[in-house]
Amino acid sequence: MNSSLTSFLFAIFFVSVTATKLLRLYLNAHGFPVLVFVVCLPAFFLADVILISAVWALICRKNGGLGLFGFAVGCVICVVTLGAASSQLGFYYHTGGELDWGDATKFAFSEDGRKVLLSEGATPLSFACAILLLSWIVKSRLSKLVSIIVSSGAVHARSALRWVATRTYSKSKFDKAETESSLLPTREHDSDSDFLYDSDDANTDITHNETPGQPGSENVGGRTIYCPRFVTGGYTMLVLLALLCIFTIFNHDRPYNRMFTTLPLPLLAVFAPKPVECSSSSWPLPALIEKVRWEKQNGNYKGWAPGSANEVIEKYRQRVPDWLPSELPYGFARWSQDSKSEDVQTLLHNTTLSHDDGCADPLILDPYYNPANDPMKITNLDNPFLEPLQQIMQERSVKIKHIALILMESMREELFPLQQGTGFHDLIMKSHDELDHDDINELLSHISPNSERITGLEGNWMGQNGTSFGRQFSEWNDETKPGFGGINIRGALTTSSVSTKSLAAVHCGTWPLAVDMFEEAEAESYQPCLPQVLELFNRIKANTSSDDFREQQWYPAFFQAVTDGYDRQDKFDDKMGFKHIVNKKRIKQDALYNPELEEINYFGFPETALKSYITDYITNATANNQRMFMSHFTSTTHHPWATPKWFNASEYMGTAHGLMQTHKDLNSYLNTVRFTDAWIGQLMQILDEQGISNETLVVFVGDHGQAFKEDVSKTGTYGNPHISNHRVPITFRHPQLPRVQHQVNATSLSILPTILDLLVSTDSLNPKDTAAAADLVQDYEGQSLIRPFKATHKGRRAWNYSLVNPGGRMLTITSSDTPWRLVLPLDKKTEYIFSDLGSDPMELELVLEWSLSSLASTVRRKHSEEAADWLREAEKVGLWWASERKRLWKYNPS
């Protein structure tokens, strides 16, 4: 083979493997004590040495059929490793995390997923060029060095074999073998070696002193046999491996397996089957569900008696509500007659996990969600309304004819709205010189003015002399009376940092499925989604065009300016029951006749492209005496944070502590937040112009947050459990509702039951619909946010769960009664993380350990015994919760 090509290929492989291994060591070194890391460091490179040697052997074979085949295999390995290394380095550059190759494959097989992967393709390409350049520079010297090492190793290996032979065989056998062939190195080089020394290189000379009596030598048959240095090195390596085994056995919580892994071995994850974990419904805290704690049925409340079969849960299983129509809409399977008639054997055959995976169903009599048998169920519907709402609810003066649900992509709570003096504002100001602060604050005051009016939270924007900045509101002429505007939730969390999973939770009132990607799209929601509930109302009453809006039919629509084909979102949208959908595909068809419409990113168009569609929808619905449920998913605040060409971007981040490029992503994100705020103002103005503002409930919620390197070293949502990815705004906007700032540690799971509670409490449904809604709202797991929230009930905590993108690796857990937060590694491949959001709201002082026992010990020492007990409890209920979601979603991984 061409020696130059061979050297270059090997250099590519060597540089790729070495660069990614050093990165892996850097990312995981904090998981080891310094002494352990230093002692084990040589052993961590063992797999790398073996792989590099194997590739060297493949591409350095001599001519012939076998040699040519080996060279071809080696070439493929080198090229694949180059691509993998550049991708891994590029991923770390952008996110600060490690790339999972199984996930990369899922993206690669999806058209929209490929667009995501290619959106930052310049970075991996740059790393690939850097690797190629470095490989070209070092190829000759590297090849020569490796040749020397391999040749020397071969010689010493033969010496070692010969030395072992002298220890094993008798002198006579040794002499006999000596007459046949000698394996010992002598003063002459071994000419049989596949690798030749450069005779001009003094460093390659290997000589042997044969001085009798030299330490480490043995005289056999008149000839001195030396203990080769290879054996000494081998003993050293064996000692290191022994120490590593001891460390592993006595401290197996450390990530030793991660340190041994090296490219291209992780690529095998592409071919790995989905892991199958059987669910178990055994509640881990049995003392909390003892019979003395059971609750009887009371009105629409179904009672609560989880555990073994009993009258309370059996009554719910067999109930057939009076409001049930003859033809059930999709989503109401558990109320059908067929679900009541199955015997035990039929249930066993059809139930949740009776599949080829060998898992048995632990709750055979409950194939559907049963609120009476839910150990975590806490209802607050028996509480009165929040004090500011009580009078207006008694007067029944609020009218809710229409509902708009605005799901805002990557919207952080701190930016809805941005307020002067907050931690996020301080983060921005640190990038500016103090002399520029007034100018920057005036600029920042224009980021979220409409969000201020929606939430009722003032931005408090003023100069250093105390003078407020004057602002103009060009998008929305809000005429809401002072003291009114609705309920703003402070302290809310998302249920998942995966957009599609969050969308399902918001629309259906369900916890997400703790598996990677949007597998919920392949199943039926275990709770009726809001469009399905509205379709139930349509079927309960006659289809008339009555002037009484409570007798009118609901017309649900979904608007999204980008693709809904990513990870099967379109499939789930259809299942939810939207009758009118506008997405990128529809807009792109119309864009042929409207050249002003432009795509701004790999997903699609800006939200402003939807303005005419939304206006037409409202106009037609009001003309046809229909009640509207309009769901709108924004997208501009998604990576890559691009805005239309006509939008005037601003420089919000400064250069006081580095170049502007340092804050490029956050600056782009802030511009998209301002764009989204302006768009929201336009939406609210449309409602005003259509004359429906006073009868429309508008719900604003973020699907998840967005972490930047200004927050934490690891950016984005993928594999990143940082709190900035999970805090979201939630606001129930209505101009006739009193303004309420409700501080509560809840999640977006509570949105759907709150909407139903509002419809019932404001007399916005006819009697039949009211009966159905008042009954259904008791079946959802979330509490109502227009009533005092129950943080605990009879010793039970109100637990909050949030999955980390991509969904099946990490689960974050909080409870409404404490400020503590646990990150639970469901896949056992990452660290346990504890934080106290009360004293450390931005999670700057995390506690990380590789086992729960170690974490509990550290938390007990740094925080309190109570906190340590809490995290043990959180881990137990978290694991139960994850498996229970698989049962309820009827998840079949096969």
Q: What kind of feature is each model-predicted range?
A:
Residues 408-413, 495-497, 511-513, 561-566, ...:
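Short, solvent-exposed loop/turn segments at secondary-structure junctions
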Residues 487-513, 656-657, 715-769:
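Substrate-binding rim/cap in mid-to-C-terminal beta-strand-loop elements of soluble/periplasmic
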